Amino acid sequence: MDKLKIEASGALAGDVVISGAKNAALPILMAGVLAETDFNVSNVPSLRDVNTSCELLRCLGAEVTRSGDDKVCISTTNLNEFCAPYELVKTMRASILILGPLLARYGKADVSLPGGCAIGARPVNLHLQGLEQMGAKIEVKEGYIKARVDGRLKGAHIFMDMISVGATENLLMAAALADGETVIENAAREPEVVDLANCLIAMGAKIEGAGTDTVRIQGVESLQGCDYQVMPDRIETGSFLVAAAVTRGKIRCIKADPKSLEAVLAKLEDAGASITTGDDWIELDMQGQRPKAVNIKTVAYPGFPTDMQAQFCVLNALAEGTATITETIFENRFMHVPELSRMGATMELEGNTCIIHGIEKLNGAQVMATDLRASASLVIAGLVADGTTTVDRIYHLDRGYEHIEDKFKGLGGDVKRVK
């Protein structure tokens, strides 16, 4: 099994090209099921989860072809299966996003209950309740969600009990082909939701309010394929910016989206970074200074993203001062803390809050990735730790970061993939 071997690397410097957003690409690929003609998606990152999504679409009978580094073409002409099997779904929670498109276009879907990162319960009840309000008959048995509808789904007024990105996306796709108007209240506002909505609009959907907490969808009878470019990955961008801050370096992220990262950039400035932005780039310069400790509380967008929490644990571990990081989105999302403690970090957990006392140096150690973003934090820690750090179970990392070792090498990082 692959591992990453990391040596202390000094200040990162240079330009890094940001990949397409995993969390936008996955729902957009699933939306291909809604299109009656060929659907061409570009800026698709080469990741394990993307490969799983393509395999799932092929399993349903769709023709999926990849060309170049970042292009995917989907044709549903021969789609004739309506079951997303456990073997595929168990490795990726986002497989649940096939439910809405299959049900909306074909009237039936059997989807295995999902797997993915081990960071909390993340129930699917909001997806199911919304689809039931749109007229679907749903039962959960033998580990599968079995959904049926006679004719088209019906537009509905849906109030979501809690903000859920996945449920908002599933209902958005289902409502695009429903009969009548659907209103989703307390909808997720994440940029990836907006990207999906923009893609659906390019396919012929009628959607208003994406990016606000109330989204209105006027259902149409059919959607057509289009050419669509996935947005840049704001979490990959943030991860490289934190790595530069921790190593006291200066880097520029190219093909980035500064507007989607405002909460993260504000915290990096609080930590002492000088931030400059253009339309599609972000430059961070620490001017050789040690970061200052910053308090973090994860909240739904436009607040501070839970997917950047682990990286800021590393920043605070090496910062000047003491900070608290409070996780409000997922339970069980501090599994990186014991691993960072093995490297010498001074951290203590109290419920959903981590108290971090900054120290000057970490020490290299053998550590284990427990989920996608935790694994990124361990790589960042390895870049500034004395000695060698080995990160095991990096299949988590490959789910969400494209060519991460090559990108760090391009910035001067000593990161190697080994067996």
Swiss-Prot record:
Phosphoenolpyruvate binds at residues 22-23. GO terms for cellular component: cytoplasm. GO terms for molecular function: UDP-N-acetylglucosamine 1-carboxyvinyltransferase activity. It catalyses: phosphoenolpyruvate + UDP-N-acetyl-alpha-D-glucosamine = UDP-N-acetyl-3-O-(1-carboxyvinyl)-alpha-D-glucosamine + phosphate. It is found in: Cytoplasm. It is an enzyme of class 2 (transferase). Its EC number is 2.5.1.7. Keywords: Cell cycle, Cell division, Cell shape, Cell wall biogenesis/degradation, Cytoplasm, Peptidoglycan synthesis, Pyruvate, Transferase. UDP-N-acetyl-alpha-D-glucosamine binds at residues 93, 307, 329. GO terms for biological process: cell division; cell wall organization; peptidoglycan biosynthetic process; regulation of cell shape; UDP-N-acetylgalactosamine biosynthetic process. InterPro entries: Enolpyruvate_Tfrase_dom, Enolpyruvate_Tfrase_sf, MurA_subfamily, RNA3'P_cycl/enolpyr_Trfase_a/b, UDP_GlcNAc_COvinyl_MurA. Transmembrane segments: none annotated. The active site is at 117 (proton donor). The keyword Cytoplasm applies. Pathway: Cell wall biogenesis; peptidoglycan biosynthesis. Cell wall formation. Adds enolpyruvyl to UDP-N-acetylglucosamine. PANTHER family: UDP-N-ACETYLGLUCOSAMINE 1-CARBOXYVINYLTRANSFERASE. Belongs to the EPSP synthase family. MurA subfamily. This is UDP-N-acetylglucosamine 1-carboxyvinyltransferase. The lineage of its organism: Bacteria, Pseudomonadati, Pseudomonadota, Gammaproteobacteria, Alteromonadales. The gene is murA.
